[in-house]
A protein has these predicted regions:
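Iron-sulfur-associated redox domains of electron-transfer enzymes in respiratory
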Residues: 1-135
């Protein structure tokens, strides 16, 4: 596993796996699933650094290298790690013509569970969630 922010913007392949630093030791079985996926794993801890630093770094990488797929993976229920899943939205706003595929996973019950874009967007919309829960 490489540190994302310490990686040169040109030193990336076609698939990047970006995982919360704690995933490896908090959910080792789920992390093993990540290790079986094609691509290099990059770690980032959003308790230690601001999400905007990660967004800027990834935009730099995506604008220089033909990255076909970015996978985000985190532990579930972390107020910090959830920000990993918001990065796609910020990147696509800055780079609307980007053709990179984004996939999101959370580690749940010792396994990775894919999370869809609608769920991620709704997690940022507390008012909308409140309405849904009241129905």
């Amino acid at each position: 596993m490489k540190n994302l922010l310490e990686t040169n913007v040109y030193d990336v392949g076609e698939t990047m796996i970006i995982a919360g630093t704690c995933l490896k030791y908090m959910q080792p079985k789920a992390y093993e699933e990540l290790e079986k996926m094609p691509g290099e794993i990059y770690e980032v801890c959003l308790e230690a650094i601001h999400v905007n630093m990660v967004i800027t770094k990834l935009i730099g990488m995506l604008s220089r290298v033909n990255i076909k797929k970015v996978i985000f993976a985190s532990v579930d229920k972390s107020p910090h790690c959830i920000q990993l899943h918001y990065i796609e939205s910020e990147i696509t706003k800055a780079m609307p013509h980007l053709k990179t595929e984004f996939v999101h996973y959370v580690a749940l019950d010792k396994a990775l569970k894919e999370i869809d874009e609608k769920t991620i967007k709704m997690s940022k919309n507390l008012g909308g969630l409140q309405v849904l829960l009241k129905e």
